[in-house]
């Protein structure tokens, strides 16, 4: 998973990243980041299995407060060990609010946790002058 200020798909199928980060320093709370994106890449190196997958993304704050809960579907071709199938999912959000300094958890579940379950951390802190 990668966090960035700006991400765009290029005509040749690549992703351009600008402002990649692994923590956020904000001037005040609540924090309203103007541009907040994260990218996940999935790789499949087997020739069998599902091609349609459901993804569930949760952003969790203090006391298990859910800032975001979103579900979507993505499709992924079957691959093989010599040439794996890859898909990159770009999630852009302009409406997220971080209410206070905290290490927020991004929980990713694919196919109800059967195919994949991961948690990533993002510290959001008050900028020190």
Predicted features along the sequence, with ranges:
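Contiguous segments within soluble domain cores/interaction surfaces
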Residues: 1-100, 105-110, 114-129
């Amino acid at each position: 998973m990668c966090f960035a200020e700006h991400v765009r798909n290029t005509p040749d199928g690549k992703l351009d990243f600008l402002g990649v980060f692994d923590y956020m320093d904000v001037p005040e709370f609540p924090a309203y980041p103007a541009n907040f994106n994260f990218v996940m890449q999935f790789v499949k190196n087997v020739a069998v299995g599902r091609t349609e997958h459901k993804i569930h993304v949760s952003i969790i704050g203090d006391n298990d407060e859910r800032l975001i809960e979103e579900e979507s579907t993505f499709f992924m071709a079957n691959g093989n060990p010599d040439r794996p199938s890859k898909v990159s999912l770009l999630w852009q959000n302009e409406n997220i609010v971080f209410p206070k300094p905290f290490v927020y958890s991004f929980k990713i579940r694919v196919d109800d946790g059967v195919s994949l379950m991961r948690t990533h951390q993002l510290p959001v802190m008050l900028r020190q002058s």
